[in-house]
């Protein structure tokens, strides 16, 4: 069943967390005119153009991001409202191992009207992450929009339990949203406060014929600091460094970082960009992801890579220390 709760955006800094902070700082620096804040809250309208992945890139006019070449999108940086996502599963209590349909409806927070216009980000308008309560199971899927404006996806969950849903989207003229939800299958013990026992795991992992190694900063990961997660990828059979990674959703990789309490979420992409049009499109063997992790604790890291037409996922568990604990 889907728990009857009002879903709100994750109140955490994410890779997109700087959207409001970064854009507002740019506005105060004179990058774009400052609108009437009260009027903006009542009648949101685009007042700037931002990069969905680098929110401190702000301009008055359309264009592309100088860092990632992603198209800038219209945004109202003073629209701090949290959009609503209504979820409905059919059957209402999905059975593990059997397909079911999940419908997600994005609603405007004031009028509660269905939001139909979402901006395409990394080739999709709606990114949905489905993660088991124990952080062992992970899916990154893309619901399709229906004539009524809702988004639908058919899923199969491998085992009973509580699953966290993260709806990641950008309303046209608004700011990026990450809206959390909860899905409970038939036969699950819906103890949302159950303690989580994660063990640190930074050893190399093999998936899709690739051996993926993760290197952390020499002094470890520190909360509140821009960090770099560095990956080296080899062929699992030969041990040779690979150079044939393929683009997946307009990037050479996708990484999701989630805190053990499931409250802090980062969706990141490699610093290594896809080549210019007309150039060979192959990546590897090294990729670097930037992440700002807001608090100390243990985090689960999933990274998706595509090679030879197959998307594979590797998972690591890392510790983040507090600045005072260094």
Positions of PLM-derived features:
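Intrinsically disordered, low-complexity terminal tails/loops enriched in metal-binding residues
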Residues: 2-326
